[in-house]
């Protein structure tokens, strides 16, 4: 399936000089969305991981579908203050400043192999922080899965120590 042809582009969003790649058209097409999840599961067979983590917010969509299709649990990696109970936090730098990611304490068990999902890999800051957070709570990063990768932003460099799979690379 040609996901690249389905992506919408928005220049100067969210700030001047950025060409935003929107997965919205893929989300609106159930066949394309199912294909994307299935293709990533083909690249990361369920025997190779124990749980899937989705990064807020568009990573939740892909992770939920992959979780249901693989029969594996799904963990949310969220912005601060969005998860109940005890959480583990990790601060990291972004291209816009600094941010924090959280996961619920105990959501990833020690030694579990985790696939981390997000819609897009750009500078790699969020993906690297999510990987560090998974490791901080005792998990092992089995891989990172993206619908889109913006190669010119060199995000892959920040997660070079991990296996990554992207369906569309610009």
Swiss-Prot record:
Highest rank taxon of the organism: Archaea
Localization per Swiss-Prot or TrEMBL: Cytoplasm
InterPro entries, alphabetized: Ade_phspho_trans, PRibTrfase_dom, PRTase-like, UPRTase/APRTase
The protein's Enzyme Commission number: 2.4.2.7
GO biological process, one term: purine ribonucleoside salvage
Coiled coil location: none
Keyword tRNA-binding: no
Catalytic activity field: AMP + diphosphate = 5-phospho-alpha-D-ribose 1-diphosphate + adenine
Keywords, sorted A to Z: Cytoplasm, Glycosyltransferase, Purine salvage, Transferase
Family per similarity comment: Belongs to the purine/pyrimidine phosphoribosyltransferase family.
Protein name, UniProt field: Adenine phosphoribosyltransferase
Organism, scientific name: Cenarchaeum symbiosum (strain A)
Gene: apt
